[in-house]
Amino acid sequence: GMDFDARSADRLPFHDDDEVTPALGPTSSDARLRHLERVPLFSGFSEDELRRIVDRSRIVEVAAGTVVTEMGEPGDSFFVIIDGTVAARTPIGAGSELKPGDFFGEMSLLDGEPRSATIVASTDLRLLVVDRTHFWHLLDETPDLIRRILTILSRRVRRLEQTVHAILRGTSPA
């Protein structure tokens, strides 16, 4: 329901695992594990590593049109898209799309600053959600995850640099 997690600054009309909608099916840890196995971010992880992620996260279902994070708000959760797509709106880039396997919300956890983007569910979503405390524990326990997140963040920074250069040159980026 609406009070799904009083500590979370991401005020989301989530359905938590306790009151799951029928569409979501079973939410046993085995079912959650199956979901995680489909996420490229976790590909090649051992069963143990995946179980650690399952233990430190929850899977929630969000209706299309829901604002998942609001730019300028404090952020306390890291999100990985399992099913569905979201639109990310930032001050400079309206509407990059994130798809299954993509993650968001990491920047506020890493630097403590407010959300840098407004993220809206374009479709019904199934999200893996990790809160701040669990996020740091998870990074301690799963060094591979740090490497992967850093690699992806580096790519994002490069893309952003290319976009900025293209704007400065007066051409639009590819």
Question: For the regions a protein language model found, what residue spans apply to each?
Answer:
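Cytosolic regulatory regions built on CNB/CRP/Popeye-like sensor folds
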Residues: 1-174
